[in-house]
A protein has these predicted regions:
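A structural signal for short, well-ordered beta-strand elements
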Residues: 26, 129-132, 164
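C-terminal helical cap/extension that packs against the catalytic core
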Residues: 95-151
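Short beta-strands and strand-loop turn motifs
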Residues: 154-158
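Phosphate-binding loop of NTP-binding sites
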Residues: 145, 163, 176-184
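Nucleotide phosphate-binding/pyrophosphate-handling subdomain across enzymes
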Residues: 2-105
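A short acidic, helix-capping loop that chelates divalent metal ions and anchors anionic groups
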Residues: 56-57, 161-165
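Phosphate- and divalent-cation-binding pockets in alpha/beta enzyme and binding domains
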Residues: 69, 117-121, 164
């Protein structure tokens, strides 16, 4: 099995697979282990691969409710992503997100009460394209317009959900529904 066989991104997931393999070695056939790695899309709302549509991978990381969680998610990809971020303002600093976004984000689609703070953090380090939207529907539509074959769309808000949703699960489920309803 190669690293590229693991469907979910990130060094931490490679480490998780190595630990799991060690735990079941001799009890589970290597072919079964490899098949699981190739097909497991992740835990809901945690860098969860929702679908590949027209060559674009759509990931739901609604659990990314702080800059540090979004930073960890951004660092797990091997290419720049289209980032959907923003939400309720917990009055935390967004400055650490700027340099990471400068290195890992192709376009940022921002919404919610923290949209301005996230934009300021990014602008302090980069002039990457930023699109402002009012809600998740507009964010998904904008990402769909911008995304090209080979791109990754990563919804990781770096913010709480309470300005638009009851919780991160509701936000993630809404994103999932919008992504899954897009025509092939």
């Amino acid at each position: 099995m190669n690293r590229s066989d693991i469907l979910i991104p990130g060094d931490h997931n490679v480490e998780n697979y190595l630990a799991a393999i060690a735990a079941v070695w001799g009890e589970v056939a290597p072919a079964t282990i490899a098949e699981y790695a190739r097909t497991f899309g992740g835990v809901p709302h945690r860098s969860e691969l929702l679908r590949v549509r027209r060559g674009v991978k759509w990931y739901n990381d609604s659990i990314g409710s702080s800059p540090s969680r979004t930073i960890a998610g951004l660092k797990s990809f091997d290419r720049r992503v289209i980032l959907i971020a923003g939400g309720y303002d917990k009055h935390i600093p967004y400055d650490p997100l700027g340099p990471v976004a400068a290195d890992t984000v192709k376009t940022a689609i921002l919404m919610g009460a923290t949209g301005d703070k996230i934009e300021q953090a990014i602008r302090a380090c980069s002039d990457l394209p930023i699109v402002r939207v009012k809600n998740m529907e507009e964010a998904v539509a904008a990402a769909n317009r911008l995304a090209q074959d080979g791109d990754i769309v990563f919804m990781s808000p770096a913010s709480a959900s309470f300005d638009m949703y009851r919780n991160f699960e509701e936000r993630g489920n809404h994103f999932r529904r919008l992504v899954m309803e897009m025509e092939e």
